[in-house]
């Protein structure tokens, strides 16, 4: 039986691909060496210890239909579209060695005429003109008996969209968690016009086979054609859940404020595990009672716009004589938290 395994995903769903990756990693034989190749449609992928509200413009992502996906490895936030090729190398220990997988990617690029080098924070860089530019970023995960190295290659990504989604709104947010380091990047198409996913995928496959002097047939994975992956349904449910993608954020505080014709309001939130642990409201309104009641209602609520909107609607029902003013406040609060 071959020690190599090659898997290719036909799905562009980040939650599907990350669930497949996690299941294969848990269930692989310790003597196997696995290469998994995949792509995600519009997605921001964050590291295991990151805070999405700090890293991302969550409101813009929701407006544009961009998914958020938290991976199980560390590292920073990245934007994926179909101009990226994603790779994952897995191996049991002591065979797992991220320098080997890095070399395979470098060999694949060299076979296409692209000279890249490993640099700094798990990056691959090229010289573009007089500048050194990043074309690949990676992250890693290790357990007692195995490890994986996964990353992306920028082929023809829409780099203008990085700034749209990887910069948070200018909110008054004091947050713990790992902050992404922004790098100067370039697409491989700038160096090799005509490069596409199929070409780079084939080059990586061939470099993988050449390194280990062995070839295997690819297993193509899709939602309609899953390999035997016990626990996949549960893992996909986790990867796609708000509780994992948002609720795993480290504790943080958030202050929002605005002014209406009837008075100004300022809300202080302490958020823990994606829920409002403490809420304080300050106001110069002549009738602060409804706002004090809102602060009490928000205690313990999930820190997500739909949950807060539902609470606000019940709150408004308690003060029918102030419906217009409280609807204003509700609409503002739900929008500012997106």
Curated annotation (Swiss-Prot):
Primary gene name: lplA
GO molecular function, one term: ATP binding
Organism encoding this protein: Yersinia pseudotuberculosis serotype IB (strain PB1/+)
UniProt name for this protein: Lipoate-protein ligase A
Protein location: Cytoplasm
Signal peptide (residue range): none
Catalytic activity: L-lysyl-[lipoyl-carrier protein] + (R)-lipoate + ATP = N(6)-[(R)-lipoyl]-L-lysyl-[lipoyl-carrier protein] + AMP + diphosphate + H(+)
UniProt: (R)-lipoate binding residues: 134
Any one Pfam family match given in the protein's UniProt record, by short name: Lip_prot_lig_C
Biological role stated in the UniProt entry: Catalyzes both the ATP-dependent activation of exogenously supplied lipoate to lipoyl-AMP and the transfer of the activated lipoyl onto the lipoyl domains of lipoate-dependent enzymes.
Recorded GO CC terms: cytosol
Additional detail: In the transfer reaction, the free carboxyl group of lipoic acid is attached via an amide linkage to the epsilon-amino group of a specific lysine residue of lipoyl domains of lipoate-dependent enzymes.
Biological pathway: Protein modification; protein lipoylation via exogenous pathway; protein N(6)-(lipoyl)lysine from lipoate: step 1/2; Protein modification; protein lipoylation via exogenous pathway; protein N(6)-(lipoyl)lysine from lipoate: step 2/2
